[in-house]
Amino acid sequence: NISNALMFGFPNETTQELQQDIEHAISLNAEHLSAYSLMYEEGTTLYRLLQQEKIKETDEDTYLRMYEMLIDKMTAAGYEHYEISNFAKPGFRSRHNSSYWHEVPYIGLGAAAHSYRRKPEVMRSWNAADIHKYIQTITEGRTEQEHEILNKETRYNDLITTALRTIDGITLEDIKKEFGDSFYRTLMTEADKHIARQQMVIKDGHLALTRKGLYISDDIMSDFMLV
Protein backbone atom coordinates (compact mmCIF):
# COMPACT_ATOMS: atom_id res chain seq x y z
CA ASN A 1 0.00 0.00 0.00
CA ILE A 2 1.89 3.05 -1.27
CA SER A 3 0.69 6.52 -0.32
CA ASN A 4 1.64 9.79 -1.97
CA ALA A 5 1.39 13.24 -0.38
CA LEU A 6 0.35 16.38 -2.23
CA MET A 7 0.48 19.95 -0.98
CA PHE A 8 -1.34 22.81 -2.66
CA GLY A 9 -2.07 26.49 -2.17
CA PHE A 10 1.50 27.69 -2.66
CA PRO A 11 2.07 31.42 -3.20
CA ASN A 12 1.13 32.29 -6.79
CA GLU A 13 0.13 28.69 -7.58
CA THR A 14 -2.56 28.48 -10.25
CA THR A 15 -5.36 25.95 -10.61
CA GLN A 16 -3.71 24.82 -13.85
CA GLU A 17 -0.48 24.02 -12.02
CA LEU A 18 -2.37 22.08 -9.37
CA GLN A 19 -4.25 20.20 -12.09
CA GLN A 20 -0.92 19.04 -13.53
CA ASP A 21 0.21 17.89 -10.08
CA ILE A 22 -3.02 15.95 -9.51
CA GLU A 23 -2.84 14.30 -12.92
CA HIS A 24 0.77 13.32 -12.26
CA ALA A 25 -0.20 11.86 -8.88
CA ILE A 26 -2.97 9.84 -10.52
CA SER A 27 -0.55 8.58 -13.19
CA LEU A 28 1.67 7.11 -10.46
CA ASN A 29 -1.21 4.77 -9.63
CA ALA A 30 -0.52 4.66 -5.88
CA GLU A 31 -3.22 3.19 -3.67
CA HIS A 32 -3.54 6.27 -1.47
CA LEU A 33 -3.13 10.04 -1.60
CA SER A 34 -3.05 12.60 1.20
CA ALA A 35 -3.54 16.21 0.08
CA TYR A 36 -3.02 19.22 2.32
CA SER A 37 -3.25 22.96 1.83
CA LEU A 38 -0.17 24.97 2.72
CA MET A 39 -0.22 26.40 6.24
CA TYR A 40 1.84 29.37 7.37
CA GLU A 41 3.19 28.49 10.81
CA GLU A 42 4.55 31.23 13.05
CA GLY A 43 8.34 31.09 13.36
CA THR A 44 8.93 29.67 9.87
CA THR A 45 10.60 31.39 6.93
CA LEU A 46 7.36 31.28 4.93
CA TYR A 47 5.47 32.99 7.73
CA ARG A 48 8.10 35.71 7.93
CA LEU A 49 7.96 36.30 4.17
CA LEU A 50 4.17 36.50 4.38
CA GLN A 51 4.35 39.09 7.16
CA GLN A 52 6.86 41.08 5.12
CA GLU A 53 4.44 40.94 2.16
CA LYS A 54 7.11 39.32 -0.01
CA ILE A 55 4.70 36.50 -0.80
CA LYS A 56 0.91 36.41 -0.96
CA GLU A 57 -1.34 33.80 0.59
CA THR A 58 -3.78 32.00 -1.71
CA ASP A 59 -7.18 33.66 -1.42
CA GLU A 60 -10.16 31.67 -0.16
CA ASP A 61 -12.02 31.53 -3.49
CA THR A 62 -8.97 30.14 -5.30
CA TYR A 63 -8.37 27.62 -2.52
CA LEU A 64 -11.97 26.38 -2.74
CA ARG A 65 -11.71 25.98 -6.52
CA MET A 66 -8.49 24.02 -6.04
CA TYR A 67 -10.02 21.77 -3.40
CA GLU A 68 -13.13 21.16 -5.50
CA MET A 69 -10.99 20.24 -8.50
CA LEU A 70 -8.92 17.90 -6.34
CA ILE A 71 -12.03 16.04 -5.18
CA ASP A 72 -13.51 15.84 -8.69
CA LYS A 73 -10.35 14.52 -10.33
CA MET A 74 -9.48 12.01 -7.61
CA THR A 75 -12.98 10.54 -7.41
CA ALA A 76 -13.22 10.40 -11.22
CA ALA A 77 -10.00 8.37 -11.17
CA GLY A 78 -11.61 5.79 -8.88
CA TYR A 79 -10.37 7.01 -5.51
CA GLU A 80 -12.67 7.17 -2.49
CA HIS A 81 -12.68 10.52 -0.72
CA TYR A 82 -12.94 8.96 2.74
CA GLU A 83 -11.54 11.81 4.84
CA ILE A 84 -11.23 15.54 4.25
CA SER A 85 -7.57 15.30 3.22
CA ASN A 86 -7.35 11.64 2.16
CA PHE A 87 -8.23 9.57 -0.89
CA ALA A 88 -7.87 5.82 -1.34
CA LYS A 89 -8.59 3.10 -3.84
CA PRO A 90 -11.30 0.70 -2.59
CA GLY A 91 -9.93 -1.36 0.29
CA PHE A 92 -6.87 0.83 0.84
CA ARG A 93 -7.92 3.33 3.49
CA SER A 94 -5.15 4.17 5.94
CA ARG A 95 -5.62 1.84 8.91
CA HIS A 96 -3.07 3.80 10.92
CA ASN A 97 -4.85 7.14 10.64
CA SER A 98 -8.29 5.55 10.94
CA SER A 99 -7.42 4.41 14.46
CA TYR A 100 -7.02 8.07 15.50
CA TRP A 101 -10.32 9.03 13.91
CA HIS A 102 -12.23 6.24 15.68
CA GLU A 103 -10.79 6.43 19.21
CA VAL A 104 -8.78 3.20 18.98
CA PRO A 105 -6.15 3.06 21.80
CA TYR A 106 -2.53 3.35 20.66
CA ILE A 107 1.01 3.50 22.05
CA GLY A 108 3.51 6.09 20.81
CA LEU A 109 7.22 5.23 20.80
CA GLY A 110 9.91 7.89 20.42
CA ALA A 111 10.53 11.49 21.37
CA ALA A 112 7.34 13.57 21.53
CA ALA A 113 5.23 10.53 20.61
CA HIS A 114 1.67 10.49 21.93
CA SER A 115 -0.30 7.58 23.38
CA TYR A 116 -4.01 7.14 24.02
CA ARG A 117 -5.86 4.73 26.30
CA ARG A 118 -9.48 4.27 27.32
CA LYS A 119 -9.11 2.20 30.52
CA PRO A 120 -9.11 2.49 33.50
CA GLU A 121 -9.67 6.16 32.62
CA VAL A 122 -9.47 7.93 29.29
CA MET A 123 -5.99 9.44 29.10
CA ARG A 124 -3.72 11.06 26.54
CA SER A 125 0.03 11.05 27.28
CA TRP A 126 3.18 12.19 25.48
CA ASN A 127 6.91 11.52 25.77
CA ALA A 128 9.63 14.13 26.30
CA ALA A 129 10.13 16.16 23.12
CA ASP A 130 13.90 16.54 23.58
CA ILE A 131 15.51 13.56 21.82
CA HIS A 132 18.55 13.54 24.12
CA LYS A 133 16.39 13.61 27.23
CA TYR A 134 14.22 10.85 25.81
CA ILE A 135 17.22 8.61 25.04
CA GLN A 136 18.67 9.22 28.49
CA THR A 137 15.49 8.19 30.30
CA ILE A 138 15.14 5.04 28.19
CA THR A 139 18.81 4.16 28.80
CA GLU A 140 18.19 4.51 32.53
CA GLY A 141 15.24 2.15 32.28
CA ARG A 142 12.55 4.70 33.00
CA THR A 143 10.06 6.80 31.13
CA GLU A 144 9.22 10.46 31.43
CA GLN A 145 5.75 11.36 30.25
CA GLU A 146 3.22 14.08 30.69
CA HIS A 147 -0.43 13.15 30.59
CA GLU A 148 -3.95 14.50 30.56
CA ILE A 149 -7.06 12.76 31.89
CA LEU A 150 -9.83 13.53 29.41
CA ASN A 151 -13.25 14.50 30.74
CA LYS A 152 -16.44 13.93 28.79
CA GLU A 153 -16.48 17.40 27.26
CA THR A 154 -12.93 17.08 25.93
CA ARG A 155 -13.59 13.59 24.58
CA TYR A 156 -16.77 14.81 22.91
CA ASN A 157 -14.96 17.72 21.27
CA ASP A 158 -12.16 15.41 20.11
CA LEU A 159 -14.67 12.99 18.62
CA ILE A 160 -16.47 15.76 16.75
CA THR A 161 -13.27 17.14 15.20
CA THR A 162 -12.03 13.72 14.09
CA ALA A 163 -15.18 11.82 13.12
CA LEU A 164 -16.65 14.68 11.08
CA ARG A 165 -13.51 14.70 8.96
CA THR A 166 -14.42 11.24 7.66
CA ILE A 167 -16.98 10.15 5.10
CA ASP A 168 -18.51 7.88 7.77
CA GLY A 169 -19.10 10.81 10.12
CA ILE A 170 -20.40 10.41 13.66
CA THR A 171 -22.15 7.21 14.71
CA LEU A 172 -25.16 8.61 16.55
CA GLU A 173 -25.68 5.50 18.67
CA ASP A 174 -22.10 5.85 19.92
CA ILE A 175 -22.86 9.37 21.14
CA LYS A 176 -25.77 8.07 23.20
CA LYS A 177 -23.77 5.13 24.52
CA GLU A 178 -20.56 7.00 25.35
CA PHE A 179 -21.89 10.37 26.46
CA GLY A 180 -25.58 10.03 27.31
CA ASP A 181 -28.84 11.60 26.17
CA SER A 182 -27.95 15.19 27.11
CA PHE A 183 -24.90 15.20 24.82
CA TYR A 184 -26.96 13.56 22.09
CA ARG A 185 -29.68 16.21 22.31
CA THR A 186 -27.05 18.97 22.20
CA LEU A 187 -25.52 17.36 19.11
CA MET A 188 -28.83 17.01 17.29
CA THR A 189 -29.95 20.56 18.09
CA GLU A 190 -26.86 21.88 16.31
CA ALA A 191 -27.01 19.25 13.57
CA ASP A 192 -30.59 20.17 12.62
CA LYS A 193 -29.44 23.68 11.64
CA HIS A 194 -26.80 22.36 9.26
CA ILE A 195 -29.06 19.64 7.87
CA ALA A 196 -31.58 22.35 6.96
CA ARG A 197 -28.80 24.18 5.10
CA GLN A 198 -27.85 20.94 3.27
CA GLN A 199 -24.41 21.04 4.89
CA MET A 200 -24.93 17.78 6.80
CA VAL A 201 -26.93 14.60 6.34
CA ILE A 202 -27.99 11.63 8.46
CA LYS A 203 -27.66 8.28 6.70
CA ASP A 204 -27.79 4.80 8.22
CA GLY A 205 -27.42 6.20 11.72
CA HIS A 206 -24.41 8.37 10.87
CA LEU A 207 -24.20 12.17 10.86
CA ALA A 208 -21.79 13.37 8.19
CA LEU A 209 -20.85 16.42 6.16
CA THR A 210 -22.22 16.84 2.66
CA ARG A 211 -20.06 18.04 -0.22
CA LYS A 212 -21.34 21.55 0.55
CA GLY A 213 -20.41 21.13 4.20
CA LEU A 214 -16.88 19.99 3.39
CA TYR A 215 -16.00 23.44 2.13
CA ILE A 216 -16.77 25.05 5.49
CA SER A 217 -15.91 22.07 7.71
CA ASP A 218 -13.89 24.09 10.23
CA ASP A 219 -16.78 26.48 10.81
CA ILE A 220 -19.26 23.63 11.20
CA MET A 221 -17.06 21.74 13.65
CA SER A 222 -16.59 24.84 15.78
CA ASP A 223 -20.38 25.14 16.06
CA PHE A 224 -20.47 21.76 17.80
CA MET A 225 -17.70 22.47 20.30
CA LEU A 226 -18.53 22.46 24.00
CA VAL A 227 -16.72 25.32 25.74
Show the residue positions of the predicted features:
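C-terminal scaffold of the Radical SAM
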Residues: 1-181
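Residues at alpha-helix caps and immediate loop-helix transition turns in enzyme cores, especially N-
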Residues: 17-18, 186, 220
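Solvent-exposed, charged/polar functional surfaces in cytosolic regulatory/catalytic domains
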Residues: 73, 193, 197, 223
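Short amphipathic alpha-helical interaction segments
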Residues: 180-195
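A short, conserved structural fragment
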Residues: 195-205
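Minor-groove-contacting beta-hairpin "wing" of winged helix-turn-helix DNA-binding domains
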Residues: 206-210
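Short, amphipathic alpha-helical interaction segments positioned at domain boundaries
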Residues: 212-227
